[in-house]
């Protein structure tokens, strides 16, 4: 009988913390400023989807362009590092 594959408990713990932080981010007492919202967005997208893909929104889609640019700055960042940064940002936000 083959042994069960080893679970990466550190990765599982990080994923659980990330999911808890994502839920907590939706329940903050005050709305974060736009710069913080962009950080949260970019860390979340990098953690869940990896490097940015597709074309940068153009024209008058200023919000879409800002989101794309924030996410693109994280190109090459590992998903785990992005998860850790997201968790830290949410913890900081909830302390304020």
Label the model's feature ranges:
Residues 4, 10-59, 64-96:
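A charge-rich, low-complexity, intrinsically flexible signal that marks solvent-exposed coils, linkers
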